[in-house]
Amino acid sequence: MLFILIFSVMESLPTELAYHVLSFIDFNSVVTYRLCSQESNNFIKSMLVFFPINFNNLVDQSTNYFEFVEKVDLQFCRQITDEFLSSFCRVKIINLRGCDKITDSGLKHLQHVKEINLAGCYQITNDGLLGLNNITFIDVSYCPKITFKGFANFNDDSVAVVQTRPLEYPKSKPYTLVDKKKINIRYYNNHPFLGKNNHAFQKDTNQSHSKNSISYLPRIIIAPKKIIDKIETERCRLFDSIYAVKPEFRDRVFMKNYEDLLPNTHLYDKQSALNRLYKKSNRRKFIDNLLSNKMDIMIGGSIGLFCTHKRCNFEPNDMDLYLKYIDSEKIRKIESIIYQSFIFRSIVVIRTSITITWLIQSTTDEITSIQLNIMNIKSWAEVFITYHADLTCIGYEILTNKFVYLDNRWNNILQNDTNYFSNILNMESANSIYKAASKYQQRGFTCVSLNDLCTDIQGNIAKSYDHHIYDSLVSLLSDKIYNKLNIHTSDTGYQNYYQKKYTNTNLIHYIFDKYRMSENISFASSVSHLQLPKIYPDIIMLSVYKINEILDTQQNNNTGTEFHQLSIHKQKNYINKTEKFFYSARSGAQYTGINHYNKLHTVCIVCKCGCDSFMTMNDFIGCQYEYSLDRGICSRIQCREYEYLELFLV
């Protein structure tokens, strides 16, 4: 066998070079070669002082091959349990980041460990740490059951990484005394081995890039004013109609069954549409697992269009997921299903203001993107009314096994050959809408933008597009009020998105190209690491939208007045507290630009202890959401009790 020949050659190599070659060989081949002879067994044992395990389907049955290991990387091996760790009696350095099935019982097998990463092992408690008597470095980020009491048996001057800050953690002291021992508390992991692929991966995205220029995109027609006014009015009326209906009835009234449009020469029949949806086996397995877990999810975006419309000249490598009544447990369940459904080389999880995206790199280097929208929605109609164009207002509802669409939007494309893109009901800049229209123009559809890129702050037509000039009302407001530019709420399209294969090296380039102009973005190793607030918010972002007068008096639930999905529950009694913040910015918000909007909706966070302290969006737009809540507020407010409030500028 070829791998036996490879190992035979390796035995003659210097140790350092043999280590390097071994890192490119899969785990099963290593184990198989060990069983060939006594000599091969001895060679592998000598090499297994450290061996990287970089796949996610490692299970407890593989426990007999690690008795000589002293340094091991098991991060993201989600299937291993406490039993698996019983073989690591000699290990001194171990990375268990994201191994969330590990409990205190498993740590009893690691008596000789000196350096360990337990980030995301949320079942670990103080009792488990008390048995680790030789610790010099530990990462317990996102382990909510651990406090300082768990550090009592650590060595003096040990380093403890605690990226999520419990109530008792100090505000700024680098050292803390625990049972007369000096513990070095850190909020980041820079360990040369245990810190690789750490929770945050940030790059400066403030610089302009030539590929972001409009000149790189196919020319899109700008609609005349008469058409713009007509379509804006129609979409705003539909928006008002949807939000005038109680949430539990919205889908029944506004969502229609795709099969009602059949037969149609432009559309596939249902079975053909399902065949296109299930074309990839891993996608089918993922959808089947969502169904077996009874997840009330709709798959929207471009994949719905690909499955149903015959004009599509593309095959998406992504899935956009929408989940009703979202909460942190449902998010964790989705991530668990992802790990069950895909065999992958690596996963990068990216958090923006309204999405969590899993970039899944398979063992053949193919990229699959699963993007979960984390807006707190109650109906699919709320999702589709915010879409840029009618073109993508169709999706697959998993529980009912149906393709569904928003009436008076997606069915329009069967009568009208032209697809109009707008930013009426969201905060996208005209630049972003132009790029979205360009993407679908490349995909074989006729697209027209309702937003003129070449407009300055006063509304005058500019001779050419300049990215330094405000291109929308949102850019103006975000700069005047928050001193932030290029704030995006969703991914914008670049021509180089759609390569199908990426190596380990250029995967990072893919990510950076995709998100480079977005400031409000964070990278996390696992959703289980994201500390979501007790009262789960709808969304945290700057949003300009129309508030329906009907909803000011209509009580739809016991929490108060319901607003558009880009909102936080209204808390009128706190508005006076933050008036001083908005006083200086009020003059900059007088210009509304679009007559459909009559209020600016924004949000801040206030302390509930009565100290009148608060943190505005100015402090955490563009920051990592989960860190800013814990670190930003706690650096100023003594307690961790906080809540969200809604503020308006009229």
UniProtKB/Swiss-Prot annotation:
InterPro entries (UniProt xref): F-box_dom (IPR001810), F-box_LRR-repeat (IPR050648), LRR_dom_sf (IPR032675)
Superkingdom of source: Viruses
Q: Name one Pfam family in it.
A: F-box
Residue ranges of every copy of the F-box domain listed in the record: 7-53
PROSITE patterns for the chain: FBOX
SUPFAM superfamilies, per this entry?
Answer: RNI-like (SSF52047)
- Which PANTHER family does this entry report, sorted A to Z? MITOCHONDRIAL ATP SYNTHASE COUPLING FACTOR B
Q: What is this protein called?
A: Putative F-box protein R757
Specify the species. Answer: Acanthamoeba polyphaga mimivirus (APMV)
